[in-house]
């Protein structure tokens, strides 16, 4: 069926900010879909609140609205644009829920907007637990015994009839939010209560647990002519019971018989046909390893995290084709862009194995609950491709960037057998490493399979890896064993460890004996047809399929898996850099390991290498491609950390040179540079042990800010008030050493702001200054940023511009740099300089209309700012006000404290833009799901040093009609200043404490600040947790509360008697 001509204008809803469970895979899907629809000649209108994505670039759609994805704003845009149709299936759960809401409120009917892709009835049938159950019964598809409940008591009664363990699944939530496995009634009560609150329809499904079955996923596609096919099946290494987003996954599935595959394939295709989905869909099934019994777990009627993985694993572009199907094209009419010759109706065939390993944020959240279950906790993932399981698994391990280069964490060797077995059974984020350690200690695959229900097939592979380790240890320098190890994915570093030599010597031995990798093409058809995709992975075998072209090339290093502190913003910069390299006439080569992102879409670059970002893997590509140079400044800390070893190996680093990178990162060199340039910084010193730190702090005076050097995202940074706290920090938080000193700085409480600058070595372009709403002390990634600045004097802005120019030229910066300043009493201090692209690049690029990463890349390749038409200095300001606001994923991370400080905690961001500060703030708060009703109660629980300031806020809240509640000390302080607040108990005061008020819905916002002492603030933590669990707006910085007040004041009227 040809494409539809009765519709011209289509609105696409994006997925909003990145949160755990909904990450960069939707930027990739949305970008593909918008371009795919434009290619077919439709006018595309995009709504998405996330500025950090490629998807919200002007070129991606005909009209791009970076506005909140809420009923209020989406309705406005629908009325203004009057599209014929709406495509919501590429915006994750956010897009689907928005479509449901628009429909339920009658907006789609009123405006005559048709829904494309998936009908509302199908969304309902897949998402509403009751309707899903009915449909499965009609199709005679087995599902676990279950019951829908709306109260905790109903849940307890049902569990009594089927027995524990049971699983709780709230309806219409994302990434298993609020769900979990319950072994007894106490856990069931707790999880169901929370699940009912988080479900928008107050509904949970209680089902019999089938934990221990194999978890299999099928990624399927269907068109309007009822053609349907399986793109790819995938098998979880971890059995059912751990969220698939937190599981290690292999594609294609490895342990199913032909009969089992056929059985589950038929089930998946019959489900997508029954739901009449036009586009992509993901079906999750549980297979009993001991019989042919299976259950359908769930269906996602949309593009998902698994579809991004399936697209990258097979090369089959699911989102692109889903968009074409949505407008009426059929699979037998669309050419598969990978082969360029076969139709999309051919099912992909793979002649390799793909491994995906999730990346968790527990390096930032040491207190977080690491036990894995049905609620997702990973922030990102890595993928690796190999010719066997061992190779793809080990390549994926070293892609994770958690300080491992093999499937082992050396520290685990010291763990007792009891602890080891407990960690093997009770899965945490690092279970793979504990299982591998158990094998090294002689536990058999059979014993481990019995304990974990992991298929023995995979455990045999781990045993095989261990056997190769022993072989290597027994035969140093043996070329045959070396070849075997390389065929199975071993890194040079691991081999060097086992041989007691250096990585360099192993590399030399390999090169001398021509033991080098070949690169194979990902072609969707197991080499049956000719393919034209420049998409490669390395393996040790024969026949290299990646041919170096005659054109001069430039290699760009990506930023690896998404984690807190290094998010999709860096992928954004990478993609823009590639565009500029191509525009300059070079061949652009990308190397990255993240399957969720736009940069690993093979149509973005001239060549894509899907490889770990380690020195060895990067050098292998450089040896083959011989590029003009490597660009490291867009790949975050990942790429910057590779600059030095690459330069030592003789590779040309394009842009700022290694010595200058060092001057910005190394504390003593940086201080020296600032002295020479006559730029003030807060007084500070470096310390390599506890005594030195105490001495430095006494000299500088408390409070001090302490942190390790060379980190991204403020890891292990703290503000300490006294010597006792400082000593405790030095003992527990960091491993200080002469190689890794700790920085001790005077902590200046002032206004913070940051600048991104682009330099060609002579001139410096400053696109804009961003002013932070929160004072210094909250990590810049967690602060709300305002552009253009609203409170900085002209003099301060000129000083900032002057210091920025001096720094860029003085540090010989070529390309991008980011500088953070703090201002106190009109004096400007430099806090830090990052000689690379920062996380504010996408936001600032969008609000100033300067494609910053592209400009920087052109300068790196030799053009000048004046040639590109840019002036030296600060770029003219925008007339509108733009705000970048952080978004957090605390609901997903139990035991993580939501208090903001110098260590970054946000996972994503949104943008609000309007004519005034108040309106822009309103949009930013709405987009980040911080919605405050216009009346109700605000509770204050404030540390002594901030009570004065809080009093003023409380008065303003009272003036616009809010009730004020406060904890004992705060209430007494307010009363002594003539403001009566209703006192509330802190914690444990039965039904008079804050958490019970929150549960009863009597509190609309919580304002809670903490002193800077390092004492455990358990009460405060419980109060903050109760706010997170019940979705009550929580402010841990008075500046943010003040910003919210500005919004409320601008929207409220004062009513007074005359």
Swiss-Prot record:
Region of interest (Carboxyphosphate synthetic domain), ranges: 1-401
Entry-linked PROSITE patterns: ATP_GRASP, CPSASE_1, CPSASE_2, MGS
Binding site for Mn(2+) 2: 298, 300
Binding site for Mn(2+) 1: 284, 298
Region (Carbamoyl phosphate synthetic domain): 547-929
Bound cofactor: record note: Binds 4 Mg(2+) or Mn(2+) ions per subunit.
Pathway(s) this gene product operates in, as recorded in its UniProt entry: Amino-acid biosynthesis; L-arginine biosynthesis; carbamoyl phosphate from bicarbonate: step 1/1; Pyrimidine metabolism; UMP biosynthesis via de novo pathway; (S)-dihydroorotate from bicarbonate: step 1/3
Protein name: Carbamoyl phosphate synthase large chain
Organism ancestry: Bacteria, Bacillati, Bacillota, Bacilli, Lactobacillales
